[in-house]
Amino acid sequence: MIEDKFMRVLLMFDVPTKSKKEQKLASKFRNNLIKLGYFMLQFSVYMRICKGLSSAKSSIENVKKILPPYGNVRALIITEKQFDKMELLLGGIVFNEKVNNETNLTLFDIDSHGEFKYKNSNNEEIQINKKQEKYHQQNLFEF
């Protein structure tokens, strides 16, 4: 039921950035969030799309391991339906939201031969061209 639904983890944070050391810690925290799969929704609000509640909770546990020593960090888990009800009062949809939406997610499964089978968010299989085309640059100097 709820494990089959896409969930969104919203992280909202305020961390001090007055000294050089605080700026470095804040930057390190943001970079670690990106490494964990979060993307910026707006300043100091990051989001990650997870498949199911347990994955969302696990994602929050991973964030707890990288918290800066000072500041205020909050996490909120919402369903895709709740996220769609969000009202945009001012401004527009940012590039990160367009790229990281539910319809652009690709999931994968492993078949009986150990090969990856890619699926979209509707669990439909996607065909991937496994052959890599080789491109050769022409010689700049002909002798």
UniProtKB/Swiss-Prot annotation:
Family: Belongs to the CRISPR-associated endoribonuclease Cas2 protein family.
Name of the featured protein: CRISPR-associated endoribonuclease Cas2
Binding site for Mg(2+): D14
Any GO BP annotation: maintenance of CRISPR repeat elements
Cofactor(s) required, per the database record: Mg(2+)
Function: CRISPR (clustered regularly interspaced short palindromic repeat), is an adaptive immune system that provides protection against mobile genetic elements (viruses, transposable elements and conjugative plasmids). CRISPR clusters contain sequences complementary to antecedent mobile elements and target invading nucleic acids. CRISPR clusters are transcribed and processed into CRISPR RNA (crRNA). Functions as a ssRNA-specific endoribonuclease. Involved in the integration of spacer DNA into the CRISPR cassette.
Natural source organism: Campylobacter jejuni subsp. jejuni serotype O:2 (strain ATCC 700819 / NCTC 11168)
Keywords: Antiviral defense, Endonuclease, Hydrolase, Magnesium, Metal-binding, Nuclease
Disulfide bond annotation, renumbered to this chain: none
Alphabetized Pfam families for the sequence: CRISPR_Cas2 (PF09827)
Quaternary structure and partners: Homodimer, forms a heterotetramer with a Cas1 homodimer.
